[in-house]
Amino acid sequence: MSERTASQPNTDRSRRRLRVVLDVALSDAAACPLEEIDGEVTAVRHQYTGDDCHADVTVAPACPDDDRSDVMHVATQTTDSCLCCVFSDHGCVPQITAVAADTITVETYLADRTTLTDLVADLKAVANTVSLTHLTRLAADDQSGDSHTHVTLDLFKLTDKQREAAAAAVAKGYYATPRGADLSDLATALGISKSAVSQRLSAVESKLATSAFTEAQQSAGSAP
């Protein structure tokens, strides 16, 4: 019996500091087979290998009285305009969390804000629109000694400039305790003045506070 030679696989490990959720409205060029699934998609498990994409798609039962979900397997060959390819090009693992009409919601983890900027730019090249809806900072700067700081922002109701400022603030630790960056750092990163950064973040915080207050009122009003 021949002996199998053990080989050491090449492993690339890097810490992911940001969690993002993106709503991607697909263009015809970036059409995804998930759009063709009939019914409400409740879960997607997919594997992207080489030029092939395989997905197990769980679909909610059409009848409310039926508690059995259908699982559809979808296999397709990818192209350069495939969303999975774009994420892979940036070293990201996409997790599809929702499919509605022509919009796919994707969650992924990133190393830094530069990767986020590049990823969104490349997604916009193959999609109709790309919206960053949630951004979570998973770890504070190494110097702080705190690796459990989580800061999350819901960015859905912000303008593009406000979203950019909020993303930079979270990514650089502006909202961490202690702060990992100040207004000067953010101004340098964004290429704008400190006063402009301050104004944008004030608008962000105001919108987020208003949204949170409204949601709290609605929850209180619907409580029995």
From Swiss-Prot:
Signal peptide: none annotated. Keywords: Activator, Transcription, Transcription regulation. Residues 158-209 form the HTH bat-type domain. It comes from the Archaea. Disruption phenotype: Cells lacking this gene displayed a marked decrease in growth under anaerobic conditions using either DMSO or TMAO as terminal electron acceptors. InterPro entries: DmsR-like_N, HTH_bacterioopsin. It holds the Pfam family HTH_10. Involved in activating dmsEABCD gene expression related to dimethyl sulfoxide (DMSO) reductase. Required for anaerobic respiration on dimethyl sulfoxide (DMSO) and trimethylamine N-oxide (TMAO). This is Dimethyl sulfoxide reductase transcriptional activator. The gene is dmsR.
